[in-house]
């Protein structure tokens, strides 16, 4: 059986945290900021954690990621 490979596109978009979670960037941050409030823009600057349901789904894709 072939080796499980890390999904490289996903590996470039997330970082594993010390506690084993996955940190990701946020969507809606590339353009069209005039339609967003100052509060939204400020909150979009922060990184976010991958949700529990998504983590279960993508765990296989990151099998060999450190």
From Swiss-Prot:
Residues 1-53 are annotated as: Disordered. InterPro entries: Ribosomal_bL35, Ribosomal_bL35-like, Ribosomal_bL35_CS, Ribosomal_bL35_sf. Pfam families: Ribosomal_L35p (PF01632). The keyword Ribonucleoprotein applies. Keywords: Ribonucleoprotein, Ribosomal protein. The keyword Ribosomal protein applies. GO terms for molecular function: structural constituent of ribosome. Residues 1-16, 23-45 have a biased composition (Basic residues). SUPFAM superfamilies: L35p-like. GO terms for cellular component: cytosolic large ribosomal subunit. One of its GO terms (biological process) is translation. Signal peptide: none annotated. Belongs to the bacterial ribosomal protein bL35 family. This is Large ribosomal subunit protein bL35. It comes from Enterococcus faecalis (strain ATCC 700802 / V583).
């Amino acid at each position: 059986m072939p080796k499980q490979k890390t999904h490289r596109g996903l590996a470039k978009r997330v970082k594993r945290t010390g506690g084993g979670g996955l940190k990701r960037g946020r969507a809606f941050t590339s353009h069209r900021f005039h339609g967003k409030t100052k509060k939204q823009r400020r909150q979009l600057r922060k990184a976010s954690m991958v949700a529990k349901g998504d983590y279960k789904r993508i765990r296989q894709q990151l099998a060999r990621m450190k």
